[in-house]
Structures are given as structure tokens and as C-alpha cells.
Amino acid sequence: MKRFSDKRTQIKTVMATGTFDIIHPGHGFFLEEAKKLGGENARLVVVLARDSTVRARKRTPIIGEKQRLEVVMMLKPVDEAYLGSETDMFEIVHRLKPDIIAIGPDQKFDIDELRDELRRRGLECEVKRVGKYRRSELDSTCKIIKKIRKMEFDEDALKNC
């Protein structure tokens, strides 16, 4: 039997990237919206920033990379998850060859620069920014950290920790 490719049924791979340090609803919403960019039956692949990368660009991660990877793999929209490269963020793009790279609404990537660099490296994929963002009291890891720092815990509250 001869097989043919029908673009209407072709499964698209969407790649989403991030730190995913302290998981919160904003992460879940981003991943759901990222997967939708690929249409029906899309496959969502998530690439997590390595601890060394997070330290260099943001802060020391609260949760280590292996545990962050384990938690992200448990999230409903995620089909596969990987740790990124410590030296070349495009290495995993080259290896996985996604159809679409999803950029979060709060991620500081210049879409045009990213597209140009992908083309320069011979990588053919769309780059799309997730436009929606679900606001909530604790919709970022930094907000969670700041709230914890402000709280005063007495010994009774911590005795079972």
C-alpha cells in the first residue's frame, strides 16, 4: 500500500522552552497555548534551561534541572521534555527539528532575530509568540519567591516540614 502525506492530518511538533522552576498556573497555560499553535494532534516538546544557564541569565534555580524535567514531563500538554544544551541553544532545535517554536508572552526573545539565526543555521521552522497570558496573583516564579520571603513562619508552621 502506498503512503502519502496529507498536510491536513500531518502532526506538527511544537517546541516550547523555559526554566519551569517553581511550576505555577502560568506555566500550564503557556504550555496549553503553545501546543494549540500546532493545530489538532500537535506534539509538544518542552526544552528546559540547564541550571548553569539559569544561573548565568536569571538567578540560582530553586529546583534542580533533573527534578524540573521530571515535573514538566508530568504536565498534561507535554508529550516529551528534554534538558537544553549548556553551550548552544540551537543544538536541540537541530536535533528535534520542530515545525514551530513557541515563545512565551514574557520571554525576552526578539522573534525576527531568532528567525534570522535559525535560517542562518539552516533550520526551517516557524517562530510564534503565545499572545495570551492568564494573570493571577502568583503567575511567575519571582512572585512566588517574593511572597515566601515576606511571610513570617513560626516554629509550629515549620515543624512538619
Curated annotation (Swiss-Prot):
Keywords: ATP-binding, FAD, Flavoprotein, FMN, Nucleotide-binding, Nucleotidyltransferase, Transferase. It catalyses: FMN + ATP + H(+) = FAD + diphosphate. GO terms for molecular function: ATP binding; FMN adenylyltransferase activity. It is an enzyme of class 2 (transferase). It holds the Pfam family CTP_transf_like. GO terms for biological process: FAD biosynthetic process; FMN metabolic process. It comes from the Archaea. Its cofactor is a divalent metal cation. ATP binds at T19, F20, H24, P25, G26, H27, D106, Y133. The keyword Metal-binding does not apply. Its EC number is 2.7.7.2. InterPro entries: Archaeal_FAD_synthase, Cyt_trans-like, FAD_synth_RibL, Rossmann-like_a/b/a_fold. Pathway: Cofactor biosynthesis; FAD biosynthesis; FAD from FMN: step 1/1. Homodimer. Catalyzes the transfer of the AMP portion of ATP to flavin mononucleotide (FMN) to produce flavin adenine dinucleotide (FAD) coenzyme. HAMAP family: FAD_synth_arch. Belongs to the archaeal FAD synthase family. This is FAD synthase. It comes from Methanothermobacter marburgensis (strain ATCC BAA-927 / DSM 2133 / JCM 14651 / NBRC 100331 / OCM 82 / Marburg).
